[in-house]
C-alpha cells in the first residue's frame, strides 16, 4: 500500500465458523468503499472476532485460537479467489480477544473502537447488517447516537424483497428510527451535530424534554432523522451475495453438531482450508447441546445472581403474603398485583 489516506472497515462478529459468503461480502464491502473514494485511498478490512466471554455456545465451545486460524484461512481464500486490488488489505484483528484476556468480559462496540486513534476514527466504517442497524435506530441498544457520530456505518441488506419490498432498505430504516428513545438514552449529552441542529431550530432543553415525554412539536425534530441517515452508507443490494443469510453460520454448525459424518454442506459453505481444519480437530461436535447453559461472562454471572436473588425475594414475599391473607380474611381479595413493566 502506498502512502495514501486509509479507510478502515471494522467487522466484528462471531465468525464461528467463517463462511465463503462472509468472504465474498467482505470483498464487496471493501471494493465498494474504495470505489466511493475513486479508488484513491487505502482500505483496511478488519475481521474482529468476539472473545470467549460473548454469551453464545458456538463461541464458548471453540477455542479463540481456532476461530483466529479459521479467519486467517478465510483471508487466504479471499486473496486467492478474488482479484484484490493492491490498495485493499484484509486483516484478522485479535483486539477483542486480547481485551477479554485482560478483563474476563465481552467488549462493547465503542470499547472495541478504542483500537483507533481519534484521527483514525474519522475514517472508520462499521460493517453492520440491516437487522443490526434497525435494532440500533429503534433504541434497543445503548449509545447508538454516540456510535453513529463517532464512526460511519456501512449497511448491507440481508432481507428478502418479499419482506421489505424492492429498493426499500433506506426507507425501511428511516421509518424505524425512534427519536424519543434515542434522545432519552443520551440524557442531553448529544453529538455536536444534534446540538447544532437544536441551536439552528431554536429548540431549548424544555422543548426536547416535552418532545421526549409527549412528542410535542414532533415535526421540528424530523430533521434529526436525516442527520442519522447521513451517517449510513448502503451497499447496493446486488453486491450482497445470494448465499449470504443470517443463518449461514448456523447451518454449518447444525451439520457439524448433528450430522458430523455428512460433509457436503460444510464443503459447500466453507473454504477448503476451513473445512479441513474443522473436521481434523472435530470442532463444533455437539456444541450447542454441551454449552448452551454455560455462562462465562462475570457480568452475566452478576446479572444471573441478581435475577436469582430477586426471584428468592419474590418467593419469600409471596409466601409471607399468603400467610397474611390466610390469617386476616378482612383483607380485600380484589387487591391487584403490582404492574410489571419492562423496557428492552
Model segments located where?
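Nucleotidyltransferase catalytic core that binds NTPs
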Residues: 1-299, 343-344
Amino acid at each position: 500500500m502506498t502512502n495514501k489516506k486509509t479507510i478502515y472497515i471494522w467487522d466484528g462478529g462471531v465468525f464461528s465458523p467463517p463462511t465463503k459468503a462472509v468472504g465474498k461480502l467482505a470483498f464487496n464491502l471493501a471494493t465498494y468503499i474504495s470505489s466511493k473514494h475513486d479508488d484513491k485511498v487505502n482500505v483496511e478490512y478488519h475481521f474482529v472476532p468476539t472473545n470467549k466471554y460473548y454469551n453464545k455456545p458456538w463461541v464458548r465451545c471453540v477455542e479463540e485460537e481456532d476461530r483466529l486460524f479459521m479467519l486467517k484461512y478465510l483471508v487466504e481464500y479471499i486473496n486467492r479467489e478474488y482479484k484484490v486490488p493492491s490498495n485493499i488489505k484484509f486483516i484478522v484483528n485479535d483486539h477483542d480477544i486480547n481485551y477479554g484476556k485482560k478483563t474476563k468480559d465481552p467488549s462493547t462496540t465503542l470499547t472495541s473502537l478504542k483500537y483507533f486513534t481519534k484521527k483514525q476514527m474519522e475514517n472508520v466504517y462499521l460493517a453492520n447488517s440491516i437487522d443490526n442497524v434497525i435494532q440500533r435506530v429503534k433504541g434497543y441498544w445503548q449509545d447508538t447516537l454516540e456510535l453513529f457520530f463517532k464512526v460511519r456505518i456501512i449497511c448491507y441488506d440481508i432481507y428478502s424483497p418479499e419482506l421489505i419490498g424492492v429498493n426499500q432498505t433506506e426507507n425501511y430504516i428511516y421509518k424505524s428510527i425512534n427519536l424519543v428513545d434515542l434522545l432519552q438514552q443520551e440524557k442531553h449529552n448529544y453529538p455536536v451535530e444534534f446540538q447544532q441542529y437544536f441551536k439552528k431550530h431554536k429548540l431549548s432543553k424544555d422543548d426536547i424534554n416535552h418532545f421526549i415525554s409527549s412528542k410535542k412539536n414532533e415535526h421540528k425534530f424530523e430533521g434529526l432523522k436525516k442527520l442519522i441517515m447521513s451517517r449510513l452508507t448502503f451497499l447496493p443490494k446486488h453486491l450482497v451475495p445470494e448465499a449470504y443469510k443470517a443463518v449461514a453460520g448456523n447451518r454449518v454448525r447444525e451439520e457439524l453438531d448433528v450430522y458430523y459424518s455428512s460433509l457436503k454442506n460444510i464443503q459447500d459453505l466453507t473454504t477448503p482450508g476451513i473445512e479441513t481444519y474443522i473436521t481434523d480437530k472435530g470442532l463444533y461436535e455437539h456444541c450447542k447441546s454441551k454449552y448452551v447453559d454455560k455462562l462465562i461472562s462475570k457480568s452475566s454471572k452478576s446479572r444471573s445472581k441478581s435475577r436469582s436473588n430477586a426471584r428468592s425475594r419474590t418467593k419469600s414475599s409471596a409466601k409471607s403474603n399468603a400467610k397474611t391473607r390466610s390469617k386476616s380474611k378482612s383483607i380485600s381479595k380484589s387487591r391487584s398485583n403490582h404492574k410489571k413493566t419492562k423496557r428492552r
